[in-house]
């Protein structure tokens, strides 16, 4: 997914430019400037790499510190904050509100939180701190040398045809003003079940590790979708479609599942596991992507997209 194929996914909340003062030509931020950037409902450390005037509005190409470059994107000034102590406090408050501040969750929190460091130094320090903690735990169990982080090992190769799908997905939503019709069929749960059936027929059985990885994909998808897998104009549709205890994996399909795979290396960046475990997981994820590619004509269809119409009791509402 190229840098040009990214829609602005700003939060609908408070998105002021954080006390920025315009330059003589109206720019609020400059190339090379370290900033804080909204992505979904949270704020992340970022760096402005390019600045361009587009349709009488300044746009800023940002790189989220510690994230894969596939998530670099063009944003408006209302997505950015100056890197100040005041705004760092705001960042921490938003993180706490979303339940991702360190120590607010036990057990699974290390596997589900995303990187939210304000700058490169903090990013590196956090990584070192977590790695040190992981090594300490492994040392106590006698397996320190086998302990590695996903950041070093997790490399998911997305097939070319699926990369094109990700680009097409962006174009449908950002340029053609469409959204994926919900509920999708097959949905994520059904796709995972179909893969399980496929593996059973192919190999005669499915190992416990494969089954656990598939359960993990479902869990990550349900947690990640509302905070990092939706474009801005998809949010009202999400609010209308996911009610009560409905799981996103029973409503959304392969289009949104592919977005998760782009994000997985970052989601796994704090997880410490034995190298053999990571290797097995990477192999399963790659095989699963090949399965989606093989069934692309069934799972991923242009007809799955429809115009984003104003809610009239029949269609989904447009997030203006």
Swiss-Prot record:
- Cross-referenced InterPro entries, in alphabetical order? Chromo-like_dom_sf (IPR016197), Chromo/chromo_shadow_dom (IPR000953), MRG (IPR008676), MRG_C_sf (IPR038217), MRG_dom (IPR026541), MSL3_chromo-like (IPR053820)
Please state what the protein is called.
Protein MRG1
According to the record, what happens upon gene knockout? No visible phenotype, due to the redundancy with MRG2. Mrg1 and mrg2 double mutants are late-flowering under long-day growth conditions.
Where do Polar residues bias regions lie?
12-24, 106-115
Keywords in alphabetical order, please. Answer: Chromatin regulator, Nucleus, Transcription, Transcription regulation
Is the keyword Transcription in the record? yes
User: Which positions make up the signal peptide?
Assistant: none
Which ranges carry the MRG domain? 150-318
Residue ranges of the Tudor-knot domain? 30-80
Identify the PANTHER family for this entry: MORTALITY FACTOR 4-LIKE PROTEIN, MSL COMPLEX SUBUNIT 3
């Amino acid at each position: 997914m190229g840098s040009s194929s990214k829609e602005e996914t700003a939060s609908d909340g408070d998105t002021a430019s954080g006390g920025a003062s315009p330059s003589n030509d109206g720019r609020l931020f400059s190339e090379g400037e370290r900033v804080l950037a909204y992505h979904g409902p949270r704020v992340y450390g970022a760096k402005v790499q390019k600045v361009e005037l587009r349709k009488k509005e300044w746009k800023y190409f940002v790189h989220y510190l510690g994230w894969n470059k596939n998530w670099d994107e063009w944003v408006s000034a209302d997505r950015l904050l100056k890197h100040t102590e005041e705004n760092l406090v705001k960042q921490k408050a938003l993180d706490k509100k979303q339940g991702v501040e360190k120590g607010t969750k036990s057990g699974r929190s290390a596997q589900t939180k995303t990187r939210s460091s304000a700058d490169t130094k903090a990013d590196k320090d956090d990584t070192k701190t977590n790695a040190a903690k992981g090594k300490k735990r492994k040392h106590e169990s006698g397996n320190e040398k086998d302990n590695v982080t996903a950041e070093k090992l997790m490399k998911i190769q997305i097939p070319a045809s699926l990369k094109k799908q990700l680009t097409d997905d962006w174009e449908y939503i950002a340029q053609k003003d469409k959204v994926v019709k919900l509920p999708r069929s097959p949905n994520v749960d059904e796709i995972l079940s179909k893969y399980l059936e496929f593996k059973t027929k192919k190999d005669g059985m499915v190992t416990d590790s494969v089954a656990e990885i598939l359960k993990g994909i479902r869990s990550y998808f349900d947690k990640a979708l509302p905070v990092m897998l939706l474009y801005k104009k998809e949010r009202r549709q999400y609010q209308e479609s996911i009610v009560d205890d409905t799981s996103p994996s029973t409503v959304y399909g392969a289009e949104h599942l592919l977005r998760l795979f782009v994000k997985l290396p970052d989601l796994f960046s704090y997880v410490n596991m034995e190298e053999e475990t990571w290797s097995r997981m990477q192999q399963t994820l790659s095989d699963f992507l090949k399965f989606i590619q093989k069934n692309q004509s069934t799972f991923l269809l242009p007809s799955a997209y429809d115009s984003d119409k104003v809610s009239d009791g029949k269609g989904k509402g447009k997030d203006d």
